[in-house]
Amino acid sequence: MTDKTVRWEPLKSTSVFSTRVFDIHEILSRSPDNQDHTFYSLKASDWVIVVPVIHSPDGEDEFLMVRQWRHGVAEESLEFPGGVMNPGEKPEEAALREMLEETGFTAKKIYHGATVSPNPAIMSNHCHFFIAEDLQDTRETHLDEDEYVTVERIPVQTVQERMG
């Protein structure tokens, strides 16, 4: 092990491009050996992902998942409900809101699983993961105007097998 520092000193950050979803910032930073370098970072809101679990008396538990089109990969994606946090919103509040909006389900129990930096090399935000249990179906979704989602119950075992 070494005592050498790896810390860079951020000197300046300038927004160079903005969209409704993220901003791109040009960042000037000074390296540990006193050299200045330019980097680019995506600045976006934190977001949440909720893993809704439907417990079955026979032990065949299921996950509640959503299928939707993802423009980044230009294909359908089967994923857990989630989305961007609103300003001032707590992660747990966002998790419950997103699950209700996308699936029509609420949860009596919700647990924080983890908070991660999805791509800290170029992104400034965090993703908060939650597990939701004791679900109730309100039978009413509240999708964004550009959101087209189908809700699917997928056996936990199937999801585990697909993950390899």
Annotate each language-model stretch with its function.
Residues 2-14:
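A short, amphipathic edge element
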Residues 5-8, 39-42, 51-54, 58-97:
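Conserved Nudix-box catalytic region and its N-terminal flanking loop in Nudix hydrolases
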Residues 11-51:
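Acidic, metal-coordinating catalytic segment for phosphate/diphosphate chemistry
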Residues 19, 72-73, 120-122:
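Short glycine/serine/proline-enriched coil/turn segments at secondary-structure junctions
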Residues 23-27, 62, 126-128, 150:
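Short beta-strand micro-motifs in enzyme catalytic cores
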Residues 32-33, 54-58, 69, 133-137, ...:
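Short loop segments at secondary-structure junctions
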Residues 37, 47-49, 83-164:
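Unchanged
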